Structure formats: structure tokens, C-alpha cells
Amino acid sequence: MSGQQRGSVILVPEHLAGALTKLMSDFITGQDVTLSGGNIAVKIRDAINQTPGGGDVAILSSLFALWNALPTSGRQSSRDDLIPAAVQALTTAHNLCLGVIPGETSHKDTPESLLRAIVTGLQKLWVDSCGCPECLQCLKGLKAIKPGLYEIPRIIPHTKQCSPVNLLNMLVHKLVALRGHVQLAYDARVLTPDFHEIPDLDDSDAVFARTLLAALFHLNMFFILKDYITQDSMSLKQALSGHWMSATGNPLPAAPETLRNYLEAFRNSDNHFYLPTTGPLNTFKFPEELLGRVVVIDSSLCAASHVQDVITRGVGAGVPRPRFLALPPAPSREPQQTCSQLTSRGNESSRRNLGQPGGTSPAVPPVCPIVSLAASRAKQNRGGTGSLHLAQPEGTSPAVSPVCPIASPAASRSKQHCGVTGSSQAAPSSSSVTPVASLSGDLEEEEEGSRESPSPPSSKKGAEEFEAWLEAQDANLEDVQREFSGLRVIGDEDEDGSEDGEFSDLDLSDSDHEGDEGGGAVGGGRSLHSLYSLSVV
């Protein structure tokens, strides 16, 4: 390959042109990830079998050819595509700092001064909020952060891991150790720490910490991308300057034409070949010009408002700080709910876990256990008469569920919970139990018996039946728990002062009771006697 050709002259014998051309082509296209601007000079020396300390003209000419081919190469083009991402990261970090630490930052700050302001703010926050040995250790990690392709040490106390830190360190490891390429597919949310990735702080301090950390992570992403974009050009210029100094004893000239003319003077008929290049000679200010395209504040690419939405509103990857519900107020000791309403909560819970009880329609409220037991005993004692039955109100279907025997002082409450339409019969003042019809037995016979004896039994007999039922329930706790699922019976004197036989408060942590009507305060802390106490009209 002798003769004058367009391109950069490479002063090596023609028999070495094949191996050297392949090496230089792999560097320009980026196919060989092991090649970089820092080690390409050594690779060239190995390819031409030149010992260290030998003539630098061959290596100098090869480096100059790569320098002229770099701006339009596929290797540099893939890095230029990351310039908008780097500008966005820097602009976002800058605007986040102006929002939370406006006194320590300004529009004229360099990325390095911005990093120092963020580190100072985080160090002060860790000391003021806790100051334990772990926090002090993280202060050293913050101080050790350096701009560039460096991993982030431990900087957040009282946390096991942080997703943005893992992402950035993995990216650095891929670029430095594995010599990989960067293909960014992320948005600002992945560089915003979640609320569980910071220490347990007050709400205002938590927002401040997450904002400063998000600014720090965006700034670190900028430093990584900046070095990745400009590293090859800077390393190649440094190698070119060193070999020019070794060959001539002078610093690198300002114009590339000086170096080209120097190399052309060594060209003979059999000691060179040309590497084709396009375009003019690459200026030696190329790294600085490339850096000027990266270190830019562009408000059109800023994602600071999006990061603030993630932090303050809990959208995207960020999750708002959890709010724990307050415990329900202590219930009144006066019975204000009917038995059917109290037991319906347990039956609703049972239906969710075990399905619909056999023989019970979803549209029919559960049968009151007092009614069933009292009615069956009344039939046995009185020979099956209907003295315990009230007349069915007109217009009411026989399928209407019975009213609880514990009559509420308000008639409207009885109609609401027991499903009775029309006018309701008030309990006489001499009786505290209002007996009603039971679903067991023939409904027509019960209606007829109710018409014959519409008046309820005496209060004395009703109280005796009720006390008998209470004794039966105390004898068999399992039946009580089955009939009143959702409530639990506690034993003797507990730590909270509740007595034997009392129902403790509903367990709010049980998922079965979440969403029940009444907010979990119904029946809490009441005994059997208080739940089914004899009412006085």
C-alpha cells in the first residue's frame, strides 16, 4: 500500500498492515470491548512486535490515525447518544438542590461543588436525626464519594439496601470491570429512593432526605455518563501527547497539521500504509468540546418535578409513608345494638371464610340463638303452644327473620335490624324480654297461636329462661365461639382488667373483620350479661 492516499499515514511495514488494521478497526467500531483509549497504545505495540522504548514513530502514527477517525466512528456515536441522558441527570440534580438547599447552591455551581453541597446536607441530617455509630460510619462513606466511574459506598444508615445505589454500582462494575456498553432504559423514578430505603425520620425530614438522595443519585449518574462519553477521547489524547513528547521532546502542538507534516516526512516507499479516514483532521480540542456538550443545564430535559411528585405524592415507584389507623373509641356499657346485629358480624365473617351456612339464605339475617333456644324450651314446657309467638304484622312475608328477644328501646331500631314492617309492638314495662316468633316449626301454626295469646309471658319467666340459656353458654365455650364468630371469650382477670366471661375487643388485626360495618367497636369489652341485659322501657 504505497503511494499517496487520502487518510492518515501509518508508519509500519506493509506486512504488518493486516493485523494492525484489524486491531484499529475493532477499536473504531467498538466490537472489541476490551479495547479502550487507555490501553490501545499497548495493544498497538504488541501488534507490531515493537519492544518498549523503541521508536515511537510507528505507534505515534497509529494513534494519530485513530484520533482522526474517532469523531465519526461508531464507537463515539454510541456514546454521543447518551449526551441527552447526562444533561437530564445533571439538570434534575441541580434543580432538586435549588429546591431543598437554595442557600448552599446557585445556578453557577459546577457539578463538583453541587456534590459537596449534597454531601454536607446529608451529613448534617444523619447527625441531627440520630448520630449513632452507624450514622457516623455513613458520614465517612459520604465523604469518600468521588465524581467519576466510582462505586458508591455505604451512605444511608439503618437500611439494608437501596435500589438506586445498587443500580449505579452495577453500572460502574459493568463499565470498569466488564468493559461493557451502556444502554440506558430508565426514568427518574429508578433514581428516587423509596420510603423504606431511608432511615425512619419525621415526614418533613423524610422528604428532605429522599430529595437530597435523589439529587445525589442523579448527579452520580451524570458523572458516570460524562466519563463514559469522554473517556476514550481524553485517554487517546493523553497517549498521543505522551508519544509525541517522547519522539520530539515537545508538548502536543495546538494544530493537528503540525503532527501530520511530521509523520509525512518519515514516509518511504515500503514503510507505511494509509488508514482511510473521512472529514478533516480532528482538532486536539475535541475532548473539551465534547465535555462542553455534556456539562449543560437544559430546563427542557429537567425531571425534577417528576421526582418531587414521586416523593411527595407517592406516585410511580415512591410509596407514601404509611398511616396507622387509630384504635376505635371505648364502647358504651349500655346495650345499644340488638342481638341479631351483633351476631350478624360474626356470621358475615364466617361466610367469607367458610361459605354460606347450610340452610341460610344470603337475604335472611341469622337466627338469634336466644330466640331458638327460648322458643324450643317454651314448646317443651307448654306442650307446643304458641304463647311465645307474636302476631305477624300485616303485609309481612312469613320468611321475614325473627326479631331479637332483646328489644331496643326505640321501635325504629327493631324494624331496621329485624326486618319487621309496619307498627312494632313495644315491650311492657313489667317485662324486660320481648319474646318473638321462631323460625322453627310450622309458621302458620305459630301465627295462629300468636293471635290466640298476643300478650308476652311474664317478666319473671322470661328472665329465668334467659338465665338458663346463659348457664348453658358458660358450660360450653365452644358453642359460644361458634355462635358469635368474630368475638373471643377471655378467662379470668386479664391484664386489661376484664372479668371472667367478658368479651374482649374485636381483633382489629384479623383480616376477617376488616371492612365490617361499625368499625370494630360493636360489642367490644362487653360481657354476656351486658350484651343481653334486661331492657326497661
Swiss-Prot record:
Pfam families: DUF832. Residues 420-441 have a biased composition (Low complexity). Residues 322-466, 486-537 are annotated as: Disordered. GO terms for cellular component: viral tegument. Residues 334-347 have a biased composition (Polar residues). Residues 492-517 have a biased composition (Acidic residues). Keywords: Virion, Virion tegument. It is found in: Virion tegument. The keyword Cytoplasm does not apply. Belongs to the lymphocryptovirus BRRF2 family. This is Tegument protein BRRF2. It comes from Epstein-Barr virus (strain GD1).
